[in-house]
Amino acid sequence: MAKINRRTSGVTGYLAVVSLIAGTLLAGTQVSSCQTEKELRGLPNFGRVTENLYRGGQSTSDGFSALHAMGVGMVVNLREDRAEIATEKREVESLGMKSVGIPWSANHKPSSAQIVEFLDLVRANPNTKIFVHCRRGADRTGVMIAAYRIAVEHKPVAEAVTEMHRYHYDWLFRPQLKRYIESLPGLLQNDPQFADYHPQPSSVR
């Protein structure tokens, strides 16, 4: 009986250690989740693209304040409502950030000029944290980020499209956006507006 008790005691001790480790890991996860929820308040569908490039949906006032606290220096608005753009511009600039509008409708594919304008902004401000958004942070924002992945980072189209879906791209009602991204490598090769982004021989696969 004593042996059984010692064995039971050993098992109990082992389970206690495992339980303690699991509890510690779980607590760490919970703290991390709380921190993330706090950081993302007012920033729907938020994500980090690179060290200095962020994406998301339409921010609230709290969200813009959070972006400012994160060190973001430029907000790029892809929404097409001129009044909303003007209102956001005042709010963003009151916090000391620069506001840039590249308006277009998610019901249509973007023009080459609009894509180039965004890519040029990012390239011209390598040390500035930039936040780009539309209404949901999914369709127009998804296209801009996919274009960045392909034109600047030379990522495969499939990888860029997968990222679009991860941020809730509306593939059912806006299939033209995916088709545009699938056509982008050809545009980079042949459209003069993308002259600065023509792929180098080493990046052509």
Protein language model regions, located:
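Cys-dependent protein tyrosine phosphatase-like superfamily
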Residues: 2-130, 143-205
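Short cysteine clusters
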Residues: 134
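Substrate/cofactor-recognition hotspot
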Residues: 137
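Glycine/aspartate-rich loop-and-adjacent alpha/beta segment that forms the canonical ThDP
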Residues: 140
